[in-house]
Regions:
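Cytosolic juxtamembrane N-terminal segment immediately preceding the first transmembrane helix
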Residues: 1-38
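Extracytoplasmic gate region of multi-pass secondary transporters
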Residues: 44, 235-284
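Helix-breaking motifs and short loop linkers at transmembrane-helix boundaries and internal kinks
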Residues: 55, 87, 108-114, 142, ...
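Conserved MFS/SLC helix-loop-helix module at the cytosolic interface between two early adjacent transmembrane helices
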Residues: 74-110
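Helix-to-loop junctions at the C-terminal end of transmembrane segments
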Residues: 76-87, 287-299
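Cytoplasmic membrane-interface "Motif A"-like loop-to-helix N-cap segments
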Residues: 85-95, 296-308
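Glycine-rich segments within core transmembrane alpha-helices of 12-TM secondary carriers
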Residues: 147-172, 193, 366-377
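C-terminal transmembrane helical hairpin of 12-TM major facilitator-type secondary transporters
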Residues: 299-345
């Protein structure tokens, strides 16, 4: 009987197979990730202003991005451990409040050192939001729709980038006559996401998989056993290492594509909005397409590999096109392939770890990868300080990281179709 009901459900469009609680869990994490993306990417538009305000070189400006990515590891590990022990919702809410606070405080910085500290603290909240939110959604959604959920969720970061692009284009120019107030206001807008917490607290349910595990532990009087050290034990250590290096290569490629792109466009004399929208619309569409493709024959690894290799081929069009039309096309296609391959990441990482370590395992691996990739803004900036043209520095990093990504994907198992059970791995 249950199989017949399942077949009837699958005959519906996929979005009608998702119930209200599952959608609320999705929107909570998705909107948090959109706003997280806005708060991080707005920095890329105002690096030149920050250089001028604090009289720093490009390497130090890039280090503001680097320290944020490094500190995401702290947030991912802490919130992931908390999510496995106390549930997914509470760490998600606290992480959103945390990154909103320090995004806003960044606008009050009176020195480079103060701004550096605030961006480091912002990174902790940014890491926590992903670590708690992704398991919340993927443990709610049906197993056969997890790839779609993954792609839609990860595309939220691109929506955040579009939002920061629009705000910079239309709000920033109004404030430029007021000097430093312009770039400081871009940071102050980042406090807005804190309002999302009120809705999450009232409307978003806890993960049913996590709740089932807690019921079982209570009935059997077993200790919880949740610990950061769990992912470094013999059974999970290879998974933790492979996933961390994999995400590091993904991060290095993504930030090579995006972090200095607004500066690249300004140096080319182009208005940034249309190209950044193209890049991120490509990322949104690509995340959905490759996430959905990962549910089919290619699997998680195959879908991401195809996207990455085609992304390598898009580099000349993305960085060296001579006409605005071709430059626009390059942005769209690089987004679709080079950024779109991220659509498989949330579900792949969630499927690699058991429920007892899913938050901390996926969160730590994702943000350990971010820490490895955190060198990207600094490296690209350092190449320029040594005489490299910005397109050459970006291209070298993009190609190298995408090729490394394809190799790392195949060092781990295929996970498509793996069920997320309350007691898996115990």
């Amino acid at each position: 009987m249950s199989s017949g009901v399942e077949r009837d459900a699958r005959s519906l469009p996929w979005y009608r197979q998702v119930d209200a609680d599952q959608w609320r869990a999705f929107w909570a994490t998705f909107l948090g990730w959109v706003l997280d993306g806005f708060d991080f990417t707005i920095l890329t538009f105002i690096l030149i202003d920050i250089q001028e305000s604090f009289t720093i070189d490009r390497a130090l400006a890039g280090a503001l991005g680097t320290v944020t990515l490094l500190m995401r590891l702290v947030g991912g590990a802490a919130a992931g451990t908390a999510a496995d022990r106390w549930g997914r919702r509470l760490p998600l809410m606290l992480s959103i409040l945390w990154f909103s606070l320090f995004a806003g405080l960044s606008g009050f910085s009176t020195s480079y050192a103060m701004l550096f500290a605030f961006r480091a603290l912002f990174g902790i909240g940014m890491g926590g939001e992903w670590a708690a939110g992704m398991p919340l959604v993927l443990e709610h959604w049906p197993v056969h729709l997890r790839g779609i959920a993954s792609g839609l969720l990860q595309g939220g970061y691109s929506w955040g980038f579009i939002l920061s692009s629009v705000v910079f284009t239309f709000v920033y120019p109004v404030l430029t006559p007021y000097g430093e107030l312009a770039w400081r206001t871009m940071f102050w807008l980042g406090i807005g996401p804190a309002l999302l917490v009120l809705w999450i607290r009232k409307r978003v349910p806890e993960s049913p998989v996590w709740l089932e595990r807690q019921r079982h532990l209570k009935e059997t009087r077993r200790p919880d056993g949740v610990s950061l050290l769990r992912i470094f034990r013999r059974d999970l250590l290879p998974t933790t290492i492979q996933c961390s290096v994999l995400i590091g290569s993904f991060m290095f490629s993504y930030y090579s594509i995006t972090f200095w792109y607004a500066t690249f466009l300004r140096e080319r004399g182009q208005t940034t909005l249309s190209y950044l929208v193209a890049l991120n619309v490509g990322g949104i569409l690509g995340s959905y397409v490759w996430g959905r493709a990962s549910e089919g024959r290619p699997g998680r690894r195959g879908a991401a590999t195809v996207a990455a290799l085609i992304g390598v081929g898009m580099v000349p069009l993305y960085l060296y096109a001579t006409s605005p039309g071709l430059l626009f096309l390059g942005a769209l296609l690089m987004g679709f392939f080079g950024a779109g391959m991220w659509g498989v990441v949330p579900t792949y990482l969630s499927e690699r770890f058991p429920t007892s370590a899913r938050g901390v395992g996926a969160g730590f691996s994702y943000h350990a990868g971010a820490a490895l990739g955190s060198l990207t803004p600094f490296v690209v900036g350092a190449f320029q300080d040594r005489g490299w043209a910005l397109p050459d520095a970006m291209a070298t990093c993009i190609v190298g990281a995408l090729l490394l990504s394809t190799g790392m994907l195949w060092l781990g198992p295929e996970t498509r179709g793996r069920r997320l059970l309350a007691l898996d791995g115990e």
